[in-house]
Swiss-Prot record:
GO terms for molecular function: ATP binding; carbamoyl-phosphate synthase (ammonia) activity; carbamoyl-phosphate synthase (glutamine-hydrolyzing) activity; metal ion binding. Mg(2+) 4 binds at residues 832, 834. It catalyses: hydrogencarbonate + L-glutamine + 2 ATP + H2O = carbamoyl phosphate + L-glutamate + 2 ADP + phosphate + 2 H(+). Residues 402-546 are annotated as: Oligomerization domain. This is Carbamoyl phosphate synthase large chain. GO terms for cellular component: cytoplasm. The gene is carB. ATP 2 binds at residues 707, 746, 748, 752, 777-780, 820, 832. Mg(2+) 3 binds at residues 820, 832. Residues 930-1064 form the MGS-like domain. Mn(2+) 2 binds at residues 298, 300. The keyword Protein biosynthesis does not apply. InterPro entries: ATP-grasp (IPR011761), ATP_grasp_subdomain_1 (IPR013815), CarbamoylP_synth_lsu (IPR006275), CarbamoylP_synth_lsu_oligo (IPR005480), CarbamoylP_synth_lsu_oligo_sf (IPR036897), CbamoylP_synth_lsu-like_ATP-bd (IPR005479), CbamoylP_synth_lsu_CPSase_dom (IPR005483), MGS-like_dom (IPR011607).
Length: 1064
């Protein structure tokens, strides 16, 4: 049926800040949906609290609210906007849960707002374990034996009935939060206790474990006329038991017989029809490899991470189609935008293999628990396309940017057999490398299949890779074998290693005998119909489908997989760069490897190459396209790291030149530049070994800030207070980059701020200065940032503007740069300069209304600020106050310490804007899910050096009616100063937690925790009390503060919202 004309205004709820389990795929889906609805003539109102996304740009919807996704604010917006309808299935679990809450309180009914797409009853049926079980029993679809537990004892009883191993799944949590596999009653008790706490309805599903079954996913679509199709089916390399977001995934499925494929396809369509889903839906199934037995694992009645992957894998835009189905259109009347001929009813067919590998944050969190289970831990993912499994897998491996270019890992090579077996059996993020190593050592693949439950078909492909390696070692420079290796995804670097020559030599030989890649089109129909999508992947075959146009071309390098330190903000800048290039009449070509993002939507750029961001893969595209130049400023450190090798190969780098990038990144050159420009920086020195570092630190004076050069996201950076800790650091952490020296700086504990600037070579524009709430020492990405600054004198602001201009001109910056300053004793020092777009670009672009990445792109292409109507200097400051707050994913990462420091730990950000600082802070805390109760108890456990400062905060808490709880030392200090405080027992390093503060936290007797213990290295073992207290607070969902500046900020909010009661 045609689209509905009885509704005019539609509201969409976004997914909020990026956390593990809910990442950039919802920016992509939401952006697509908003544009699809606008295209059909509807007025779109968007609510989302995440400033880092394209989705929250003004032009994506008619009205955009960057406000917290809470009942309080969404209700306000509903009353103000009065939409006819609400579309909740595009904002991940956040959007769904919000729609449920709005429906429950009756506001949708009161305002006569209709829910579009899948009905709430269907969402309930899919999400509520008990209802879903009833539905599956009714339609004859098999589920795992299971029961619901609302207490730990009930869970034990159920488990005894079903038999171990048991899987625990808390109801209504995202990304498997709080769940896990239990082999014993002890494990069960622990996991269920935590799961019940995290489940909003205090329920856990206790079910039989089918670990070892194959995990298969079907991405399906259905419309209101009951047309239903399979868009894509996918198979996990890892058997059931690893969260699909953490698994290696292949599309289409590889090991299913036709009967198995049809059986599971029928089951998926049966379920989506029974649920009456309207739009996209993801069905996960488990198949017994030894029979036709299968189980339905779960259904996601919404657009998901898998649907983003399926969209990019097939070219079929699921979110866009879902939005059109929601307004009443049917699959047989929506044209497929890829072919522009076939209808959306036509199931995509693939003539290639897609591999997805997850990207994990364990390079940042060395102490994190790397074991993979039913709780998701990956921050992002990469996807690669090839003509066979070997090619797509190896391309995906080198897309990960973890320093490997093949499925071999030094640690795996160094492991003895015992460790190797252990790593194969215990699923970790790096298991692929250990399995590959086992095959290299001649362990039969049958034995590996038995141990790991990985299908022997996949292991045979890994064996094939090893066989090619063995042939390469003995047949050096053999042209036919070189072709075979390239067809199977081998990189030049890997072949060079096996031949013992340089990668340049392999590239030269390849070009001599014309072993060069061709580019194939992703067209949804396996080349059955003409297709016009400019979406390509490389492979070593005959016919090249990517035709070079006569237009002036520019290549933009994307930022690869999302990880801590390099998030969706860089994708945002990439997309804006593309828009600016198109506006200037250039052909914009994007190279990227991330399936979750907007930049890899083929409708964004003029041409999209889905390829790894390595020198070889990028260079092959440059050879074909012959662009005017390459832009590296917007792809984070990934793109910046490619600037030098590309430039050496004769490629023109547009914008700031390589030697100037070096002057900002190389310590000695940077110091010289600052001296020439007469700009102060904290005293510091470089050291290449331990003794040099110690001598430097003694000269500068402790505390020192120490880090390797050339890093993003504060990798391996620490604040060090004495020589013992310094020696420990030099022995433990400097493996981060052996050929680069270590930087030792004086640590100035002042106020920090940062500036993004745009320069055309002669003039410099500063869109704004952002003041950090947390003092220097907390990574800028983990600090709350306030714009405009609230505490700086005019003199300080003038100095910052002056230094920024000097640096931009002095470093010959063309385009964007980011500078971080610290203000110590009213003197401004420069901490660091990044000659590229930074993670604050989206936030600052939105609050100043200056399209920074687009402007910078125009500068890179030779335009100047004056011509574009901008005056140099600091842009005018708006009346509102805006706060950017970091958002963390600690609940998903066991054994990772949440104490903030110079190493970045946040996965996303939220924003709050209002007329006063207090109101903006309140919104940003709410948006970041840091909700403080109006009254209750606050627990203080602080280091000795923080006690004085904590006293004032404690007094403020008491003043607004909070009770104070503290451990012995802190309590005594509070009492001496006239405060009433309840004393609790410390942990005293023992296991017995009875009567201690941990018990208080566990039983909800504490509403907030202020904890600064463990800042010094001496106590950084994970067993420290401070760490255990922080873990407990996080697992209980209790607001935790490890920086006193954040506490002061939230107190400001609470004071502004409470009335004081004073006697006269």
């Amino acid at each position: 049926m045609p689209k509905r004309n009885d509704i005019k205004k539609i509201m969409i709820i976004g997914s909020g800040p990026i956390i593990i389990g809910q990442a950039a795929e919802f920016d992509y889906a939401g952006t697509q949906a908003c544009l699809a609805l606008k295209e059909e003539g509807y007025e779109v109102v968007l609510v989302n609290s995440n400033p880092a996304t394209i989705m929250t740009d003004r032009e994506i919807a008619d009205t955009v609210y960057i406000e917290p996704i809470t009942l309080e604010f969404v209700s306000k917006i509903l009353r103000k906007e009065r939409p006819d309808a609400l579309l909740p299935t595009l904002g991940g679990q956040t959007g769904l849960n919000m729609a449920m809450e709005l429906s429950k309180i009756g506001i949708l009914e009161e305002l006569n707002v209709e829910l579009l797409g899948t009905k709430l009853s269907a969402i309930d049926q899919a999400e509520d374990r008990e209802l879903f079980k009833e539905l599956c029993e009714r339609i004859g679809e098999p589920l795992c034996a299971s029961d619901i537990a609302t207490t730990v004892d009930e869970a034990v009883e159920i488990a005894d009935k079903i038999g171990y191993p048991i899987i625990v799944r808390p109801a209504f949590t995202m990304g498997g939060t709080g769940g896990g596999i239990c082999d014993t009653e002890e494990e069960l008790r622990e996991i269920v206790a935590n799961g019940l706490k995290l489940s909003p309805v205090t329920q856990c599903l206790i079910e039989e474990s089918i670990a070892g079954y194959k995990e298969i996913e079907y991405e399906v679509m259905r419309d209101s006329a009951d047309n239903a199709i399979v868009v894509c089916n996918m198979e996990n390399f890892d058997p059931v038991g690893v969260h699909t977001g953490d698994s290696i995934v292949f599309a289409p499925s590889q090991t299913l017989s036709d009967n198995e494929y049809q059986m599971l396809r029928d089951a998926s369509l049966n379920i989506i029809r029974a649920l009456k889903i309207e739009g996209g839906c993801n069905v996960q199934l488990a198949l017994d490899p030894h029979s036709y037995e299968y189980r339905v694992i779960e259904v996601n009645p919404r657009v998901s991470r898998s649907s983003a992957l399926a969209s990019k894998a097939t070219g079929y835009p699921i979110a866009k189609m879902s939005a059109k189905i929601a307004i009443g259109m049917t699959l047989d009347e929506i044209i497929n935008p890829v072919t522009n001929k076939t209808y959306a009813m036509f199931e995509p067919a693939l003539d290639y293999v897609v591999a997805k590998i997850a990207r994990f944050p364990f390079d940042k969190f060395e102490n994190g628990d790397r074991h993979l289970g039913t709780q998701m831990k990956a921050t992002g993912e990469v996807m690669a396309i090839g003509r066979n499994i070997e090619e797509s897998l190896l391309k995906a491996v080198r897309s990960l940017e973890i320093g490997v270019f093949h499925n071999d890992l030094q640690e795996a090579q160094d492991a003895d057999d015992e460790i190797l077996y252990e790593k194969m059996v215990k699923t970790q993020d790096d298991r692929l490398f250990y399995v590959s190593e086992a095959i290299r050592r001649g362990i039969p693949i049958e034995e590996i299949a038995d141990l790991t439950k990985i299908d022997i078909f996949f292991l045979d492909k890994l064996l094939h890779i090893v066989e090619i390696e063995d042939q390469l070692k003995v047949n050096i420079f053999e042209p036919e074998l070189l072709k075979t290796a390239k067809k199977n995804g081998f990189s030049d670097r890997q072949i060079a290693k096996l031949w013992n020559v340089s990668p340049e030599e392999v590239r030269r030989r390849r070009q001599e005998n014309r072993t060069i890649p061709v580019y194939k089109m992703v067209d949804t129909c396996a080349a059955e119909f003409e297709s016009s999508t400019p979406y390509f992947y490389s492979t070593y075959e005959w016919e090249n489908e990517s035709k070079r146009s006569s237009k002036e071309k520019i290549i933009v390098l994307g930022s690869g997989p999302i990880r801590i330190g390099q998030g969706v903000e860089f994708d945002y800048a990439t997309v804006h760069c593309v828009k600016a290039l198109q506006a200037l009449g250039k052909e914009a070509i994007v190279i990227n490897s991330n399936p979750e993002t907007v930049s890899t939507d083929f409708s964004i750029s003029d041409k999209l190459y889905f390829e790894p961001l390595t020198f070889e893969d990028v260079m092959n595209i440059i050879d074909l396209e012959q662009p005017e130049g390459v832009i590296v400023q917007f792809g984070g450190q990934t793109a910046i790291n490619l600037a030098e090798p590309l430039s050496k190969a004769g490629v023109k780098i547009l914008g700031t030149q390589v030697e100037d990038l070096d002057r900002a990144e190389d310590r000695d050159l940077f110091e010289k530049a600052l001296q020439d420009l007469e700009i102060p920086q904290p005293p510091g020195a470089t050291a290449t070994n331990e003794e040099e570092a110690v001598a430097n630190a003694n000269k500068i004076g402790y505390p020192v800030l120490i880090r390797p050069s050339f890093v993003l996201g504060g990798r391996a950076m620490e604040i060090i207070n004495n020589e013992k800790d310094l020696r420990d650091y030099m022995n433990r952490a400097v493996k981060a980059s052996p050929e680069h020296p270590v930087l030792v700086d004086s640590y100035l504990q002042g106020r920090e701020c940062e500036v993004d600037a745009i320069c055309d070579g002669t003039e410099v524009l500063l869109p704004g200065i952002m003041e950090h709430i947390e003092r220097a020492g907390v990574h800028s990405g983990d600090s709350m940032a306030v714009y405009p600054p609230q505490t700086f004198s005019q003199e300080i602001i003038d100095t910052i503007v002056d230094y920024t201009k000097r640096l931009a001109i002095g470093l010959n910056c063309i385009g964007m740069m980011n500078i971080q300053f610290v203000i110590f004793e009213e003197q401004v020092y420069v901490i660091e300069v990044n000659p590229r777009a930074s993670r604050t670009v989206p936030f600052l672009s939105k609050v100043t209304n200056i399209p920074m990445a687009q402007l910078a792109t125009q500068m890179i292409l030779g335009k100047n600020l004056k011509d574009l109507g901008y005056t140099e200097g600091l842009a005018e400051t708006p009346d509102m106050v805006h706060v950017k707050a970091p958002v963390f994913s600690f609940t998903k990462l066991a054994k990772v310490d949440s104490l903030l420091g110079p190493e970045m730990k946040s996965t996303g950000e939220a924003m709050g804007s209002d007329v006063t600082l207090e109101k903006a802070l309140y919104k940003s805390f709410e948006a970041a899910k840091l909700h403080m109760a109006d009254y209750g108890s606050v627990l203080f456990t602080v280091a000795d050096e923080d006690k004085e400062e904590t006293l004032a905060l404690a007094k403020d808490f008491a003043e607004i009616g909070y009770s104070l709880v503290a451990t012995q030392g802190t309590a005594a200090f509070f009492k001496e100063n006239g405060l009433y405080v309840r004393e609790v027992e410390k942990l005293a390093g023992g296991e017995d937690e009875e009567g201690t503060l941990v018990e208080d936290i566990r039983h909800g007797r504490v509403q907030a925790v202020v904890n600064t213990m463990g800042n010094t290295r001496a106590s950084l073992t994970t067993a420290t009390d401070g760490f255990r207290i922080r873990q407990e607070a996080i697992s209980r969902g209790i607001p935790l503060f490890t920086s006193l500046d954040t506490v002061a900020a939230i107190l400001k909010v609470m004071q502004s919202r409470s009335f004081t009661t004073k006697n006269i």
